[in-house]
Amino acid sequence: MTSQPHAQSQGSHFFVLTVEKPGLASATSSGSYTPPPGATRLDAFNVLYAELTGSAPALNRANVVFFSLEPNQV
C-alpha cells in the first residue's frame, strides 16, 4: 500500500450508479467525475445516468437502484 496521493489523475467526485430493468438487465458504474463549474447534483446524475444507460440498449429507461456522489477525498 502506498500513501502517495493520485488525486491529480482523478475527478473531484467519486460516484457509484446502479440501474436495473427488472427481469432483463442490470449494470453498475463507478469512477471519478469532475462536474463543470456551477453544476448541481442533478446535473451530475443526468450525465452519469445517460452515459451508463446509453452504453447498452437493454438499459434504456432503466430504474435507478442506487446512486452516490461524494467528494473524492479521504
Segments (PLM) and residue ranges:
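Short intrinsically disordered terminal tails
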Residues: M1-H6, E70-V74
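N-terminal acidic leader/helix
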Residues: T2-P37
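Compositionally biased, low-structure terminal segments
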Residues: F15-V16, N46, S68
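Prokaryotic Sec-type signal peptides and long signal-anchor helices
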Residues: T18-V19, Y49, P71
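Generic "edge-of-domain/loop-turn" microfeature
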Residues: P22-L24, G38-T40, L69, V74
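Amphipathic, hydrophobic secondary-structure cores in small proteins
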Residues: A27-L52, P57
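Short, mixed-charge low-complexity intrinsically disordered segments
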Residues: T53-V74
